[in-house]
């Protein structure tokens, strides 16, 4: 069938094509994942972001529960740029559950976590995310059993801290006292 008799010669045709790269993630999901870059939303949801192939692999091997997994091949470059906290987004991002025992309310609880001969690190008011991540990496290297920090220390689930740990966040227990 020839369309010229139905449409004027200079008609403009608009065709809606669903973008392939956004097919696997909705705008609402993008907003929820992006919101996890803020401590308020991490605390409300009990979730945090892990970026990078090695980091996500560490998360999957650990006792942490992975809620969602996003691959650039599935959601596309634009969607990955929108949900990533990195200037150059990695090909994979995971949304992971925070452990339930991160906050300790009393000294008796702390004492019950300690074992004779264990290696523990106590931190007070670490404010720089990169520094906390590096400290956790060093604690992991030395085989620390746990790290205890004051509550005014930067959030261990801050995306910059998570990146700086290079996976140590999944091997060293962290507690806020």
Q: What do these predicted ranges mean?
A:
Residues 72-78, 150, 177:
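Conserved beta-strand termini and adjacent loop/short-helix elements that scaffold enzyme active sites
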Residues 75-97:
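Glycine/small-residue-rich loop that forms an oxyanion/phosphate-binding "nest" at active or ligand-binding sites
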Residues 3, 14-17:
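Short hydrophobic alpha-helical segments enriched in small aliphatic residues
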Residues 47, 67-69, 91-94, 118-121, ...:
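Structural motif
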Residues 16-71, 153-154:
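Boundary-proximal intrinsically disordered activation/regulatory segments immediately upstream
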Residues 104-177:
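RNA substrate-binding interface of SAM-dependent RNA methyltransferases
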């Amino acid at each position: 069938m020839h369309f010229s008799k139905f449409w004027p010669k200079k008609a403009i045709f608009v065709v809606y094509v669903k973008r392939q790269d956004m097919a696997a993630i909705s705008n609402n999901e993008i907003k929820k994942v992006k919101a996890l870059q803020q401590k308020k939303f991490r605390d409300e949801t009990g979730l945090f972001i892990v970026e990078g192939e090695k980091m996500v692999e560490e998360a999957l091997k650990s006792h942490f529960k992975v809620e969602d997994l996003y691959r650039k091949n599935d959601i596309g470059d634009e969607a990955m740029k929108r949900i990533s906290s990195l200037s150059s987004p990695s090909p994979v991002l995971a949304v992971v559950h925070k452990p339930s025992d991160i906050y300790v309310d009393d000294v008796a609880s702390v004492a019950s976590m300690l074992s004779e001969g264990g290696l523990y690190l106590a931190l007070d008011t670490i404010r720089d995310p990169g520094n906390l991540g590096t400290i956790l990496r060093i604690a992991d290297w030395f085989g620390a059993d746990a790290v205890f920090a004051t509550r005014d220390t930067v959030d261990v689930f801050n995306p910059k801290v998570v990146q700086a740990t290079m996976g140590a966040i999944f091997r060293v227990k962290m507690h806020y006292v």
